[in-house]
């Protein structure tokens, strides 16, 4: 009787090891290197990863790469389920009123339902355009969760910073508006 139990235990152990190896291989194969946030932490100023996503308001798409060389960009990663996103998006909406002629503001609704996101924008008075990144793949390129994540992109397309503390917003806005 002990032999079948031992075989079952060994089989379970082998299955567990094979599963962990498969997970490790998948992780290595799908690791696209350091995200933008990590590169900034390392002192680098990477070129903003390109994306081409549908606007939440249905007015076409936004292709980030095509905006390079025009105006600097503030990129706001948010979701309707994110409570802190309300505060940051309202701060960005106020900043857009001051800097909107010199800086482009773009929201990226991530890991969310587009219908919830549109309702959220209307409810909170957010008027800058947002795109939909339902799978979170664009967010992953920029560093992943947590959100809100707000990045500042110079006119050249280089990412110059990420909002970490409240004081970063006016500082980075002045910096990119002058670029």
Predicted features by range, described:
Residues 1-54, 179:
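N-terminal targeting signals for export/organelle localization
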Residues 45, 50-73:
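A short beta-strand-turn-helix
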Residues 70-73, 77-81, 146:
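Short pre-active-site segment immediately N-terminal to redox-active cysteine/selenocysteine motifs
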């Amino acid at each position: 009787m002990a032999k079948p139990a031992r075989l079952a235990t060994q089989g379970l152990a082998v299955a567990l090891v094979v599963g962990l190896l498969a997970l490790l291989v998948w992780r290595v194969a799908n690791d696209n290197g350091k995200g933008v946030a990590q590169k900034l932490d390392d002192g680098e100023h990477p070129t903003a990863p390109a994306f081409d996503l549908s606007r939440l308001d249905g007015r076409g798409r936004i292709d980030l790469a095509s905006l390079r060389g025009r105006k600097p960009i503030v990129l706001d990663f948010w979701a309707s389920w994110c409570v802190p996103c309300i505060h940051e998006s309202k701060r960005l909406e106020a900043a857009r009123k001051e800097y909107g002629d010199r800086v482009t503001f773009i929201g990226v609704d991530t890991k969310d339902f587009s219908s919830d996101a549109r309702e959220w924008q209307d409810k909170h008075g957010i008027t800058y355009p947002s795109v939909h990144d339902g799978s979170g793949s664009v967010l992953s390129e920029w560093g992943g969760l947590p959100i809100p994540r707000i990045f500042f992109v110079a006119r050249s397309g280089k990412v110059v910073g990420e909002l970490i503390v409240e004081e970063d917003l006016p500082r980075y806005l002045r910096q990119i508006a002058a670029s």
